[in-house]
Amino acid sequence: RILGEVVGGVRDYGNRMGIPTIDGGVWFDDRYIGNPLVYVGCVGVMPRDLIEGDARPGDRIIAMGGRTGRDGIHGATFSSAELTDTHADEFSHAVQIGNAITEKVTLDAVLAARDHPDGCLFSSITDCGAGGFSSAVGEMGEKIGAAVRLDRAPLKYEGLSPVEVWISEAQERMVLAVPAENVEAIAAICDRHDVEWCDLGEFGTPDRELVLHWGDVEVGRIAMEFMHDGVPMPLREAVWDPEWAAREAGGDDVGVESMRAIGDVAGVFDMTATLLGHPNLASKAWIVRQYDHEVQGGSVVKPFVGPNAGPGDAAVIRPVPDRPRGLAIGHGLATGLARDPYVMGLAAIDECVRNMVCVGADPDRIAILDNFCWPGCDDPRNLGSLVRAAEACLDGGLA
C-alpha cells in the first residue's frame, strides 16, 4: 500500500503540475518498510538576469496560492525525527495536504508576473517550505527586517493561532516582495488565474527587526541579526569507524538472498526466475508507465528506448521549445555496493555520469544534485559516515 501511494502521488502531482517524470530508480530494503525514503530532484530553467533578487525596503509582502492550515506544522522537524510509537499523536498534523491544481495555477500566475510586459513585477520570491511564512519572510527580510500582519493570511478553517499561521508548511503558497506600485498588477494577474492572494505587510523596519502582529496585538518581535547569527555554529565530533559501520549495516543483500534461494531450486531456468523475481531486479515498468514523461512535449530521450523499449537510466529533454539544445538528466544508485559511504558515493556519481554520457551529455557541463538523509548525528560515528559521503561528492565532482 505504501509503495502504491508513493507511486500514485508522483504520478498525479507531476502530471497536474505539467512536470515530466523522465528518470528515477526504486530500491527495496526491509529497513524502510514503515518509513519509505523518497528523493525528488527537479530542474528549472529561468532567465539568467533574474536569478538573483533581494527584497527592498517598502516592498509589500505578498502571499499567493493555497490557504494556510494546520497541515504541515513541524513537517521538517518530523521528517528529521527518530520515529517512535509516541510520534503518531505528536506529529499527526505534520504531513502536508497537497493540491496540485492550486500549485499549478499559482505557478502560472508567478510566471505571468515575471514575464509582464512592463518587466518583472516582484523584487524577490521564495516558497513556504520548511517553516512556512517564518522561513520565507525571515529569509527575504534578513537584511532589512519585516512587519507582518498574520491575521490577513487566508485560512483553510477557523481556530488557528498566530504561531500556527506563522510556521505552517502547508504547500502551494509563494511569498513575493512586490514594490507598492506593482501590487495592483499582481492582483489583476491573480484574478485572471483564479489565484488567491493577500498583503501580509511590508519589508523594511527601522531597527532591522522582524515584527509580527495579530490584529492590533503585537505577538512577536526579534532582531534579524539575532535570528540569523545569534546562535553559534555547533562544533560536533565526527569519527569514521569502519568496523562499527560493517556491524551496523544490515538490510537486504540481493546476492546473498538469491544464493540462498538458488540452493533450494533445481535447474538453471528456475535459478534465473528466482533472481529475476527479486523486487530489486524485477522490471519496474509497471511503475514507470504510470508516469507522464511527455507533458510539455519536450522529452527527446525517454525512459524506454531502443527497438524493444528497454529501460534507460538517463533521459534528455528540450527545455526551451524553439531552441535545439538538450538537457540530460540521469541518476546513480549504489545501495549495497559497499559498507563505506565514501565508496558508495563515488560509485553513485560514477554511474550517474556514465549514464548521462551515454545519452550525449558533455562531462564538463554536468552538475551534481546531492542530498543526505542520515541517522542522528549526535552519534559521532553516524556523523563520521556522513562526512565520508560528503567527501565522496566533493572528490567525485572534482574528478
Predicted segments — roles?
Residues 1-399:
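Glycine/proline-enriched, intrinsically flexible loops and inter-domain linkers
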